[in-house]
Each structure stands twice: as C-alpha cells, then as structure tokens.
C-alpha cells in the first residue's frame, strides 16, 4: 500500500513540484511566474494527453529522446547555480534515459555527469 501511494505522488504533487522547478528555472531566464505557467501548463497538459493516448515510450521527446547530449550538457551548465533544480533535472533525466527509448544513451549519460545509472545502482546495493 505504501508503494502504491508513493507511486501516486508522481501523478499529482510531484508533477506540481516538477512544474515549480520549471517555473523557477524560467524565472532565472527572466520569465515571470504567470508567463512561465502559461508556457509550461499547456505543454504539461499535452504531454499527459499524449501519454494517455500513446503510452510513455511514444510520448517521450526532446533532447533526451533524440540523444542530443550537447543540449543536455548546456542545460546542466545553465542549472549549475541552482543545485536543487539541477538535482531534480539530473535525477529525472537519468530515470528517463534508463526507462524510455533514448538515442545515443551513453553520450546522454556522460552529459548527465556519469556512467550508467544502472551500474551506480548495482554498486550501491552491494554496500
């Protein structure tokens, strides 16, 4: 039951937290909260609608799906001064690359700052 409820957190409160991280990053780019929500809200709604119609794998897009490691590296550099937002970005990106179709996976993992998440998980389980 606890795992079910923990999983459900990703569908609502943590989705709101993810959008809040996006709003914070947008504010650093000079975009106010109202405008940021006007940009991110429809994007999030369209993504949820796509997932409902097509499933996770077919709805996954952007530089992680394309294997655009240079763009991912630029994102990380832009977020360096905001460690908590950068941590959220890295963690979600690592999970996405591990669980969803991604071109150029090794280069994306390197751009995210390390080797395979699967390998790091295995190492931590040994200790």
What is the meaning of each model-derived region?
Residues 55-127:
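C-terminal active-site/capping subdomain that shapes the small-molecule cofactor and substrate pocket
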